[in-house]
Amino acid sequence: MTVSINEVSKYFWKQTGTVQVLENINFQLEKGDFVTVIGPSGCGKSTLLKIVAGLDNDFEGEIIIDGERITKPSKKQGFIFQEHRLFPWLTVEENIAADLSLKDKYVKDKVKEWVEIVRLDGFEKSYPKEISGGMSQRVAIARALLRDPSVLLLDEPFGALDAFTRSHLQEVLLNIWEQKKTTMIFVTHDIDEAIYLSNRIVIMSAKPGEIHKVIENNLSYPRNKTSQSFQQLRTKVLQQFEHGGLIQTSI
């Protein structure tokens, strides 16, 4: 078992009272699983991801990664935000290396490997202002995976990109997953994206966020969004929103 999320609940305290954001979340991921999480806005998807990342330790329950209880960020978790969050004063290769020294041959070789995997050859010495948003997000992906984390956490990483760039980065991510078999949890509002990428789809209900349904995705790779089997699964997911009363909030 790579990741175990056990009885996780989360509350926020405001002047008007206590607000429960997550309620008794339980699910497990084996090594190499690719799970997408979808649900109404405000259901706690991003909050759950931050808890798994160790960025929020004020919650009930526990997160176990590779047998270790998680209370803070570590090399076990890689995190990719919607914004690339690159350092503007560092080059592409320096951003990928982050706090590691490129003078170290092992680090330099690892950075070179990831530059090739995310198809940024020739842009190693470029600065963030000199590359596109899609390329910047590829740098963020490489940076998050450089240390070989047990799980990669992605919080709507392609949400701000145009359709063409988004589609391209989906292929880049799938290529990485197929090569490395990194366990991934990917939050998205896009049902097609959820189906296209993952082998399991976690549907969350509105606040307080609970797991409404987990749907196994057995479509073979590479997937065709226009195929009958893809559309049938899409209908199945949509029915969960409609019949489960989740459609009241935008997804």
From Swiss-Prot:
The keyword ATP-binding applies. Keywords: ATP-binding, Cell membrane, Membrane, Nucleotide-binding, Translocase, Transport. Pfam families: ABC_tran (PF00005). GO terms for molecular function: ATP binding; ATP hydrolysis activity. ATP binds at G39, P40, S41, G42, C43, G44, K45, S46. Its EC number is 7.6.2.14. One of its GO terms (cellular component) is plasma membrane. InterPro entries: AAA+_ATPase (IPR003593), ABC_transporter-like_ATP-bd (IPR003439), ABC_transporter-like_CS (IPR017871), ABC_transporter_ATP-bind (IPR050166), P-loop_NTPase (IPR027417). Residues 3-231 form the ABC transporter domain. The keyword Translocase applies. CDD domains: ABC_NrtD_SsuB_transporters. It catalyses: ATP + H2O + aliphatic sulfonate-[sulfonate-binding protein]Side 1 = ADP + phosphate + aliphatic sulfonateSide 2 + [sulfonate-binding protein]Side 1. Its main location: membrane. Part of the ABC transporter complex SsuABC involved in aliphatic sulfonates import. Responsible for energy coupling to the transport system. PANTHER family: ALIPHATIC SULFONATES IMPORT ATP-BINDING PROTEIN SSUB, TAURINE IMPORT ATP-BINDING PROTEIN-RELATED. Belongs to the ABC transporter superfamily. Aliphatic sulfonates importer (TC 3.A.1.17.2) family. The complex is composed of two ATP-binding proteins (SsuB), two transmembrane proteins (SsuC) and a solute-binding protein (SsuA). This is Aliphatic sulfonates import ATP-binding protein SsuB. The gene is ssuB.
